């Protein structure tokens, strides 16, 4: 049976020199490339499986067959029974080019793009505006060197002293704080590792002393700023007061004791149709009221009777003991003369007034008795025995030998005493 002539097309070179070439190898292998003509360059279709990281693709790569081809020839398959030529009536050209044996597994290779650093293209990440406003920091330079911890401490001091205004920007930004905290955490980790390696070694006191001194320094600076602020706000004292304050300090324990002015109580006295107001101290006895009303009415004080409601008041009582108020009114009654009073009409009621207001004494004396009796009685009553006293009546000094009848004395007359 004659072999069918293969179709010549665009890839006709891939079919070899014809069907008869296959019998020379005793199988379906291709003719060795050494037998091909070096002057004739042909194209063959080789199935190469390029596997990428994402998915698998099978690409057909056209390779030039020639004398300089570096692709090695696949080892020939073992000889086998030649397929019948009659069955290739309607097969495609692929069957002529490919053996009819079991399908070969495609060569799987991974696509790897290896470029030199000089061949890699440089693509700008940021635009021109971003680059102009962005200051990049070199990789070999630490961020904390650009921003020392002193700036953060000054910012904390400014916040604590309140010197920054509300509208002014804060001296520290959040990313600086994050970087510093990150650096501190790394330092703490290294310290913890050192402590784990040497558990018996106590912590160095240098860190404690540094923090203590730093805190003291901050406190002193804050106090200094507060003092400066206080000096600016407080008025400047006069120079004389400042020198006096530097020399000595005067502490006023208590203020000067002012003399207490007696509180006068306006006592209302009703006599017949008249209402008399007499200023009186709360601790003063009512005897002064009796004397004032006897003088006002022209009668003997023994005839004056004071009543509060229906209660007779004693001359020794005081407004405080009686609990009298401003609205209370005392009644004054003048007693009539009795027959006993006519019998004792020879007795004179003389008033003796000393230098002080409270040194007042009323003495009963007959008209025929010398005034020496009155003088001795007054000295004993006032406790002035042994003192030199002078008694005057109407401007005349009394010697004590005078009689009241000789001087024309009457009841209620006043004798003055001077020491």
From Swiss-Prot:
Bias (Basic and acidic residues): 180-192
Entry annotated with the keyword Nucleus: yes
Coiled-coil ranges from the UniProt annotation: 209-231
One Pfam family in the UniProt entry: Rad60-SLD
One GO biological process term: protein sumoylation
UniProt keyword annotation of Coiled coil present: yes
Predominant location category: nucleus
Keyword field: Coiled coil, Cytoplasm, Isopeptide bond, Methylation, Nucleus, Phosphoprotein, Ubl conjugation
Post-translational modification: Methylation at the N-terminus by PRMT1 modulates interaction with the NFAT complex and results in augmented cytokine production.
Skewed-composition ranges (Low complexity): 35-51
Domain Ubiquitin-like: 348-419
Location of Phosphothreonine modifications: 316, 318
Annotated spans, Disordered: 1-131, 151-215
Phosphoserine found at: 54, 84, 88, 90, 92, 127, 198, 201, 204, 220, 314, 369, 390
Any one cellular-component term (Gene Ontology): nucleus
Compartment(s): Nucleus; Cytoplasm
InterPro entries assigned: NFATC2-Int_DNA_Repair (IPR052324), Rad60/SUMO-like_dom (IPR022617), Ubiquitin-like_dom (IPR000626), Ubiquitin-like_domsf (IPR029071)
Subunit structure: Interacts with NFATC2, TRAF1, TRAF2 and PRMT1. Interacts with UBE2I/UBC9.
Entry protein name: NFATC2-interacting protein
Provenance organism: Homo sapiens
Source organism phylogeny: Eukaryota, Metazoa, Chordata, Craniata, Vertebrata
